[in-house]
Amino acid sequence: MTLTRRRTLQLLAAAAPTLALRNTFAQTPPLTITPGPYTNIRAALHSYTTPDWFADAKFGIWAHWGPQSAIGAGDWYARLMYIEGTEQYDYHRKRFGPQSKVGYKDLIHLYTADRWDPEHLMDLYQRAGAKYFFSMGVHHDGYDLWNSRYQPRWNAVASGPRKDVVGIWAAAARARGLRFGVSEHLSNSFDWLAPSHLADTKGPYANIPYDGQDPAFADLYHDYTGMPANFAHTAQDMGRIAPGWWKLHYFNRVKDLIDQHQPDLLYTDGGIEFGSYGLGTVAELYNTGPYSYQNKSEAIFFSKTPNDCGPGTCVLDHERTVLNEIAPLPWQTDTCIGNWHYKLGITYKSPKKVVDMLVDIVSKNGNLLLNIPLPASGEPDAEELRILEAITQWTRINGEAIYSTRPWKIHGEGPSTKVVIHTDPTRFDPNEDRQPDLTAQDIRFTTKGKTLYAFAMGWPAQQTSKPAELVIQSLATNSPQAPGKPIDIRLLGRYDEPLRFTQDTTGLRITLPATPTPASNLGIALRINFA
């Protein structure tokens, strides 16, 4: 394409916001953190301790929702649509046309939220037992879901649904007493969007640039001026290679999210990145977030890097994986019922799988953050609603054994405790959705005060005409874990019926009622008190 003088002036005008951004940051003091006890020096964060409210909460729900969800083709669409040979590339070509003519920016209008009812959804989430809720703040695609000061064109108020999605979610959550969190996935956006700066390598559109190369859209796809000539070809999806001006932009943008919406929790998709800039986001959260009567920060920052989170500093998050044993400090698993972004035709996790994960994680001192992705409209599909209803029915009966509990001496017994689980918090567990469902032989424990709760992850099989019997070997008279002699055992959901039991060297044998409790196929919980 021949550049005329008029076209050159048009491109320079379009690029002006990004050029101004770079020049502004070049003249700006490195960081401006709200004054408080925390700074962007790592040692200053070591006084942080995880607040009790998080250890009590146990279960949160996340709406991983934005323009990429609106397309209905699953995860990482804004990147993979530009990579030849991927499912998303082929999908895009068939549905929208060649990437050199229709780019990601041209799809943002599909994110309509035209059937989004946040008040109703938050009622559903609260009834399902969630004690905290997460909104997407910004994903790797660089599209902000609030009225962003540092992304004025590509945000949910200026385009797409034309609503402050984060602010509306926050108001709905807080009105119901739920703690409110936001997620930011921005730290790797600079190189994650590199494929948008490429072109087809073959076919009728070979060598025709994708829209990431157009300076008019550098505020979305990033300005690679000054980067190595082959940067777009070599950049890795999680490389987090970015110039200094962009790292400061990252800090200011996340700070803007924090300052506008005062979240109780901030999830970062990775670790504390970019040295003092990442540490500055943690300090900003803790200095501006909620405080207890003891003047301790009650905010939570999540990192997936173990070295970030001890001593103090933050809570360790495990994406799509869990721990094998009890951890000394509270932690979190974040996972989803399907893809992170909404995908048509996908098979979701069953309610049984969700409850299995929740109970297992809580028994090990963890919390479960469960993503239920929303489509373009903002209205869950019928299967998502069915899953929510099943979880609701189960937590109504068994929530006493989940919330405000702490781990026991051991997390459980049974066949599943002998399975070694992949536990690297920086990597997905490829077998997360392939693990067999837990059964009545799989026992998990929690405690609250002097009360022990024992979960059996199913209703025990009934032998002939005899009532079903549950045997807990860890509570045998000669077990090193046994607290003593039980004096009262109740099945949650049947509080008025003390259960018959015997205890010997083979275990605690509990006779269950003739009729199972509702949702017992997902798991049951027993309240056990000792002399």
Residue ranges, per PLM feature:
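N-terminal export signals
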Residues: R7-A26
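Secretory targeting signals
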Residues: M1-L3
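Mature catalytic domains of secreted/periplasmic carbohydrate-active enzymes
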Residues: Q27-A531
